[in-house]
Design a protein with these regions (language model features):
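Active-site substrate-recognition segment that forms the wall
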Residues: 71, 110-118, 206-211, 262-302, ...
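Internal hydrophobic alpha-helix adjacent to the cofactor/substrate pocket in enzyme cavities
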Residues: 419-438
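Glycine-rich FAD pyrophosphate-binding loop
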Residues: 44-66
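Helical element adjacent to the flavin cofactor pocket in flavoenzyme catalytic cores
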Residues: 140-141, 169-222, 259-266
Length: 492
């Protein structure tokens, strides 16, 4: 079964696994958006660098190929979250985010990347009465800062997209969000990176990093036989389950199989996001949270007329446990979100990719929004892990004496924010005096997650409190207010 609709029917490009010992200026672990953008931005800045990308499965296998294709300008998961954490920088971060989205779109056009880009803007809808007044306040405050949001009352929102439950909406333009096919973008980035001289090795699992004089030794094994959705340490060892992230780290560190490849690199970039459990130094910074998605059959002309949606905007609702939805290039509806499921021990693996109870819940919620589409089939359904920090923003750092740089924790914003983060990673390696590295946003680290079993208890307790707030007109209980007060921002 395909990891996502975007990958269905696709045969991933086969790039050889790494065998033997090589040297590189920079080794990048991870062939998703963060890894590919970092490779490109480094190569553009210093064409003489030898850069290698080491990907465990294939380019776009992880979150980069399983998301909804929403490419947003935000770096901080909303103005309110940015103000909570970085009040003195939030205006600049918003400008940087919009500049980044503009530059990303220009890059797509300049390099001829065909990724079904749709610059249609984003529409947020209210399905609860209390949200209508909040929308008025949101639009008033944002437009006073120079934004160009448009408030839509019930009649106006129904004219855009027909649903009996939506009471108001806020429209933002394509400078806030665009839609695209993330797998096509990934493949386009891989092509550009290769044209710039970057070497990409797929089916190459990184199992350890070792500090050596003037660099880091990266040890890899050939994982090409595990390049379908069932890959994993558990499968390789013949176990009936995938170990937790901690277990994977312990197994990896104890793995005495001969390395199929080694890279002696001046710098290493860890760009594995939710799959970063292999590098234990990052264990407290993030949790992998599973998000689930449905994609429908193509709409008939009559079904399309029944829902409207002529503007083809990206859409989401405004609940804590929110849904996101969109039309695909072939006129299917993608509907995802709501459940955000954490598995104990930073659990990650193919056994979590399909969750029937969540798919049933999503389908029922879809029919509540679009009862006129009863009977519409959903042939594609999948899940994937999102790397989440306690601040709901990407975090940066360096280990091994500055030789290893990481960026992770996008919390759903990685399609767009990964390009900006790649610029920060480039500056860590090439431009230590960069203004970006002086941002508190870049220098600070989020509040760490506690170890197990407290981690599971805390994450799942917060999920229940968010659900309670949604059922209580958005009013946050004592726990959520306390977390807000100490700068720990949680959402779905």
């Amino acid at each position: 079964m395909s990891p996502s609709y975007w990958l269905a029917g696709e045969t991933p490009a086969s790039r050889p696994a790494l065998h033997g010992a090589i040297r590189a200026d920079v080794a990048i672990v991870g062939g998703g958006f963060t890894g590919l953008w970092t490779a490109i931005r480094l190569a553009e800045s210093e064409p003489a660098l030898r850069i290698v990308v080491l990907e465990q499965a294939f380019v776009g296998f992880g979150a980069s190929g399983r998301n909804g294709g929403f490419c947003e300008a935000s770096l901080v998961h909303g103005r309110a979250n940015g103000e909570r954490h970085f009040p003195s920088e939030v205006d600049r971060l918003e400008r940087l985010g919009r500049d980044n989205l503009r530059e990303l779109i220009a890059f797509i056009h300049d390099h001829g990347i065909e990724c079904d880009l749709e610059e249609t803007g984003v529409l947020t809808v209210a399905d609860e009465a209390h949200q209508v007044a909040e929308f008025h306040e949101w639009v008033t405050e944002a437009n006073a800062r120079g934004d160009r949001l448009v408030f839509l009352d019930r009649a106006a929102i129904q004219a855009e997209v027909h649903s009996p439950i939506w009471q108001a909406g806020v429209m933002a333009g394509p400078d806030d969000a665009v839609l695209l096919d993330p797998v096509k973008l990934c493949r386009g980035l891989a092509r550009v990176a290769t044209d710039l001289g970057v070497e990409i090795h797929e089916g190459t699992r990184t199992v350890s990093l070792e500090r050596i004089p003037r660099g880091v030794r990266v040890r890899t094994v050939d994982s090409s036989a595990e390049r379908d959705e069932s890959f994993g340490i558990g499968r390789r060892l013949g176990l009936p389950f995938e170990p937790s992230a901690l277990g994977q780290a312990l197994i990896g560190s104890a793995d005495d199989r001969p390395a199929s490849g080694t890279v002696q690199a001046g710098h290493v970039v860890v760009a594995t996001s939710a799959y970063s459990g292999w590098y234990p130094r990052l264990a407290g910074l993030f949790v992998p949270v599973y998000d689930y998605v449905l994609v429908s059959d193509p709409l008939t002309a009559a079904q399309h007329e029944a829902v409207g949606w002529a503007g083809r905007q990206a859409m989401s609702d405004a609940n804590n446990q929110f849904h996101y939805f969109r039309l695909t290039a072939d006129d299917r509806i993608l509907w995802g979100g709501y459940d955000a499921v954490y598995h104990s021990g930073n659990g990650i693996g193919p056994r979590y990719d399909h969750r029937p109870e969540t798919f049933e819940r999503l389908e029922a919620q879809f029919l509540r929004a679009f009862p006129q589409l009863a009977g519409l089939g959903f042939p594609y359904r999948w899940g994937g892990a999102i790397d989440t920090t306690s601040s709901f923003m990407v975090t940066f750092g360096q280990t091994m004496g500055g030789r290893v740089t990481h960026a992770l924790g996008y919390t759903g914003l990685g399609v767009g924010a990964s390009r900006w983060a790649a610029g920060v990673v480039r500056d860590f390696i090439l431009r230590p005096d960069s203004e970006l590295l002086g941002l508190e946003f870049v220098r600070s680290s989020p509040f760490p997650f506690p170890p197990e079993p407290l981690r599971s208890v805390a994450v799942n307790l917060v999920r229940r409190e968010l659900d309670r707030a949604d059922r209580n007109e958005g009013r946050r209980g004592l726990l959520l207010r306390a977390l807000d007060a100490v700068g720990i921002g949680f959402d779905s």
